[in-house]
Amino acid sequence: MKLTGISAAVVIFATAAIANPITPGEVQFDEYGAIQASLSGSDGDAANGAKIMTNRGKGNCVACHAVTALNDAPFHGEVGPTLDGIADYRSAEELRGIIANAKMTFEGSVMPAFYKTSGFIRPGDGYTGKGAKEEDLTPILTAQEIEDVVAFLMT
C-alpha cells in the first residue's frame, strides 16, 4: 500500500515537472540557435498555431512571411522567406529557436524575438526624455504558443 502511494506521488511530481514551461531566461540554445526541448512540455496544436500566425496581436507571422495555407489572411509580407514547405529543410528544434529568438540563428535578423524578456537596447532619456524601464518585458508569445506555431509549420 505504501509503495502504491509513493509510486503515485512520483508520477504526479514527474508529470508536474514535465508540464512546467521553460521560462525565457532558462531557454538553452545550441550552437546553431536551435532549442532541443519543448518550451511548454506539451505538444503544439497546429490549428491554434495557424491562428497565432495570423493574429495581429500575437505572432502576426504573415505580416512578413507568405504562407499559402493561410491565404485567407490579408496582406502577406515579403520581408522574410516564404514558410511554405519549411519543414522540409528545418527541424522542429530549429524552428523553435528561430521563433523564440531569431538572432541566435541569424545575427542580423529583423525578426522579433517572440520569447525574450531582457537584453533589449533601450535608448531612454536621450530620445524620449523619460528613463527606460529596467525590468524584464513580457514575451510576445507564451511557451505553448511557440509550440503551437512550430506544430503548424511542421504540417
Write out the residue ranges for each language-model feature:
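Sec-dependent signal peptide recognition
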Residues: 2-9
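N-terminal signal peptide c-region/cleavage motif recognized by signal peptidases
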Residues: 14-16
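Electrostatic cytochrome c docking/interface patches
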Residues: 21-56
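Second-shell loop/turn segments in exported
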Residues: 35-39, 82-85, 135-139
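Gly/Gly-Pro-rich "capping" loops immediately C-terminal to redox-active cysteine motifs
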Residues: 43, 52, 66-104, 108-126
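Sequence context surrounding c-type heme c attachment/ligation sites in exported
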Residues: 47-62, 72-77, 127, 136-144
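The canonical Cys-X-X-Cys-His
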Residues: 49, 57-68, 95, 149-153
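C-terminal capping alpha-helices of c-type cytochrome domains
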Residues: 93, 97, 114-155
